[in-house]
Amino acid sequence: MYMLTIGLLTALGLAVGASFGKALGVAVGSYFTACIIIGIIKGALRK
């Protein structure tokens, strides 16, 4: 489930990056990645 979500958010980040420019795209991609990692860590800690 996580892999599917990561894939979708990565694709979304790349699409946004292609639309608004590489620098902003990298920032958006990094932000999404950080959110995903934090979410996985929080989910793992709850179990």
UniProtKB/Swiss-Prot annotation:
Membrane topology note: Single-pass membrane protein
Membrane-spanning ranges: 24-43
tRNA processing keyword on record: no
Cellular localisation: Host membrane
Keywords tagged on the record: Host membrane, Membrane, Signal, Transmembrane, Transmembrane helix
Signal peptide feature range: 1-23
Cellular component terms per the entry's GO annotation: host cell membrane; membrane
Main subcellular localisation: host cell
Protein name per UniProt: Protein 0.5
Species whose genome carries this gene: Escherichia phage T7
